[in-house]
Amino acid sequence: LTANEAYEFPMMVKSFQATYWEAAMKGMDKAAEELGVTYTAQGPNSESDIADQVNMINTAIAANPVGLGLAACDTSSVQGALQTCVDKGIPVVTFDTGIADAPEGSVVCEVCTDNNQAGSVAAENMYPAIKDVIANADGQVIIGEVNQDATGLNIQQRGTGFINKMIELIKADGKTVAVKGNEFYVNAAEGADAEEADADVVIQVAVPAQTT
């Protein structure tokens, strides 16, 4: 940063309704004060309002900011905006959610969790609590798994990480497993070895119609 110049950054969050994003903005406040810059936090009413967020991103880019912070509700919906950032020389930092196949040179930094590993760790910690139930069940066992959405890369990775690790653990104990429910997660699952009707364990995956 150069002295005597004003720097303002648009920061695109996924929603203003969740306390998660309120906490994130407190971190933005702290960093902005330390660096002597300002930022404008913007975001849709809910994480399901994908088109609204895309419009906000495009409006922010049109103002030629010095940089853009982005947590995309739907990673596939922002590819065009990212290409515009490349064309205009606007650096983008993604946070919370990385963006697969982002245009080359658009994203200069990602700040996010290893979401696949986070989902895997959740399965590893859950399995001991249900292992005996699965081993001793007289019939089919259903494991419910609910994901916030099927559009955000971070949520996709967490859900898939959980499902695939759970499949691995179930099969290691000699049981068969099937995955049913949301199409994205069913297709992303690896290692399921049975049809639903024949499986010892069924992982039932759901995604709500609306996300706040």
Short names for language-model regions:
Residues 1-212:
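A residue-level marker of the well-folded mature domains of exported/periplasmic proteins
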